[in-house]
Amino acid sequence: MVMPLVLSLALTPPPLCHATLVDPRTTLQCHVRSYTFRATKPPIVNENGDPVTCQGDVRVSSCWGRCDSSEIGDYKMPFKISNHPVCTYTGRVSRTVRLSQCAGYPDPTVQVFDATGCACQFCNSETQLCEKLNG
């Protein structure tokens, strides 16, 4: 049985291990950045009828930044030519994390992905959610 996983994202500053610091007000690049989010698995009922919960903070590497975009007028519908790349991963690795607050939960693990590289690219709907980004 597949159980849904609820995630809430809490932004954290980039780790201090980077050789150069990025000024978020001026960067026009895409960077790997560390994020922390709260992962919550759905509650279950144990054999005594008591609810058992499972959650914990998870740190992942993700992409963050800004990309140059443009639009120019055109004589054909939709009367514009759009160029809107997004900051997205160029590689990722999967890992399994054990959540910290899961006493009595049968499987306290979740699968997460870490970005290994980031770049400004056009959205790929086969691997990313591209709503309202493709034109």
Swiss-Prot record:
Please state the protein's primary subcellular location.
secreted
Record text on subunit structure and interactions: Heterodimer with GPHA2; non-covalently-linked.
Cysteine pairings via disulfide bonds = 30-87, 54-102, 63-118, 67-120, 123-130
Write out the GO biological process terms: G protein-coupled receptor signaling pathway
State if Oxidoreductase is listed as a keyword: no
Location relative to the cell: Secreted
Q: In which tissues is it expressed?
A: Expressed by the venom duct.
Among Pfam families, the record links this protein to: Cys_knot
Name the InterPro entries for this protein: Cystine-knot_cytokine, Glyco_hormone_CN, Gonadotropin_bsu
Instruction: List the top taxonomic levels of the source.
Output: Eukaryota, Metazoa, Spiralia, Lophotrochozoa, Mollusca
Q: Which Gene3D superfamilies match?
A: Cystine-knot cytokines
Report the family membership.
Belongs to the glycoprotein hormones subunit beta family.
Q: Which UniProt keywords apply?
A: Disulfide bond, Hormone, Secreted, Signal, Toxin
The species this protein was found in: Conus victoriae
| Transport as UniProt keyword | no
MF (Gene Ontology): hormone activity; toxin activity
Coiled coil regions, renumbered to chain: none
Q: What is this protein called?
A: Thyrostimulin beta-5 subunit
GO CC, one annotated term: cytoplasm
| Leader peptide range in chain numbering | 1-19
